[in-house]
Amino acid sequence: MTEGTQVFLLPISTSDSTKEPLSTVTSQAQDSSLSANRPVTEKQQEEAEWESISRLLVTRGFKPLCLVKGANLRDFIVFDKQSSQRMRQAFKTLMEETTRQQSMLQELIETNHQLKSELQLEQNRAAHQEQRANDLQQIMDSVKSKIGELEDESLNRVCQEQNRIKDLQKEYKTLQMKCQHYKKKQMEQEETIASLQKEIRRFAKEEEDRVITQKRLFTHLCRRVPHSVLDKQQCGEDDSQSEGKDYLNLGVSPTYKGLLTSLQKQLEKSNSKIDVLLGEKLNLQKDLENRPTEHELRLYKQQVKKLEKTLKKNIKLQDLIGQKKSDDMEKKDEPSKDIHQQALVDQRYFQVLCSIDSIVHSPRAPGVIYKQSKERAQNRSKDAVQECGFEHLVPVIEMWADELTSLKDLYKSLKILSAELIPWHNLKKPNENEGVKVGDLLLMVDTMLEEVENQKETSSMPNSQTLQAIVSHFQKLFDVQSLNGVYPRMNEVYARLGEMNNAVRNLQELLGLDSSSSLCMVVSTVGKLCKMINEDVSEQIKRVLGPEDLQSIINKLEEHEEFFPAFQAFTNDLLEILEIDDLDAIVPAVKKLKVLSY
């Protein structure tokens, strides 16, 4: 072997040495003998290099290499100088590669931790933003609920005000009716006063005529022929005096005085009689006003007859009950008790029928339209009438029941009429359990009359053609085919408008804007906020990725795409070599190999 060869001895097992041929052993012995002759400096240099490699192996966790001197060559493998150099270079490159890979792994772990921390920060920020959004949603829900409560309160107030207005309108109508009634009474009283004044004038005129006739009679008596000397003298004196003094001269005579006093007394009596007659007339008029009418008088007479009949029947029943009680005390038989109970029940029924009869014949009851046929009235006997007298209640109650059932038809017709006259009014539906009431019908009629009067008063009311054009315009505007869908769509539009106004008001409060700010200002402020949020997101992305421009981001991603496949292949090879399944188990496995190499 030449001098360029190098002897490198490694320990091997005896079983392997026996399997090798003898030629290799002899060649190794020759090489070892030749290597002893090489220069000392090269040998020391190589030993130093191997020691440095051994130190590198020790730092990496492997067992150190040992240089053996003067030992049996059976247990060693000998390499030449070139293979030893290549082995040293391979060891160095492997060590450098492992250090580079470890540094790369360390950088990847650090970047992974950094990304995890940034991800945690972003998650915390997202959770904070989500919590803030939830808080804002809760605030919005509470504001919506408060707005709903305020709307309900306003609706209740409006309903109360409408009910109050209706009550005031009803009171106004009643006051108007009372005023008209009092006006009618005033007119009647004025008419009576005028008639009384006419009668007074007539009486006064009659009195004046009577006084004139008395005067004429008196003058006639005074001008009659005198029968005595005194009368002749008096007549001569009267003739000699002037015509203007005849009345005074005649007053001196006692006959004239007596006639005058008698006439004055008669006049006073007649005046007193006139006053008495006027007072009696006024009292009679008051009595006539307070007295019932002919119809009420008939009803009262019928009620008196019915009450007399009921009184007789009650007396008879009380007599029967007294007899039954005496019989019960004497006999104490059970059939008599049953008869007594039956009599009590009959008395209760009779009282109920009497109360119904009194209601039927009361002035408040409606007029009875039903009339019994003459044949039934003739065939019915007088005894039956005296005994019962309640046969007329059945047709009356039937007639009232028919009238009450016809109220529903009347309500339907009035509803149709109101739909034609006032379609914009939503009339309340009567409760099915309570039925139709006359008050509801009167309210419907009053509302229709009010609307008709208002239409007559307001001459500026549009005609039917303009109203139809407005309705058709609303149908086109709201995309509704029928008239019934206009009101729901309008309510929906108003509801959406209210929601939009509430949302705008909430945005104004959240953004700190004035309530008088326009929608354009709100939109511009929201756009500014979105722009700020987008800028923050872009800055966060730049902070995470590092570079500022897009091309550098693309380059970095391409570098990552080039690096990760090689790193993945390297890690897969390591996993296969070390026979493990997890990346975290690579470092412990390498440490174990390092410990085993020692």
Swiss-Prot record:
It comes from the Eukaryota. GO terms for cellular component: centrosome; cytoplasm; microtubule organizing center. GO terms for biological process: cilium assembly; regulation of microtubule cytoskeleton organization. Plays a role in the organization of both preexisting and nascent microtubules in interphase cells. During mitosis, required for the organization and orientation of the mitotic spindle. Residues 99-210, 255-317 form a coiled coil. Directly interacts with tubulin-gamma; this interaction determines centrosomal localization. One of its GO terms (molecular function) is identical protein binding. The lineage of its organism: Eukaryota, Metazoa, Chordata, Craniata, Vertebrata. The keyword Coiled coil applies. Keywords: Coiled coil, Cytoplasm, Cytoskeleton, TPR repeat. This is Centrosomal protein of 70 kDa. The coiled-coil domains may be important for tubulin-gamma-binding and hence for centrosomal localization. The keyword Coiled coil applies. Its main location: cytoplasm. Residues 16-38 have a biased composition (Polar residues).
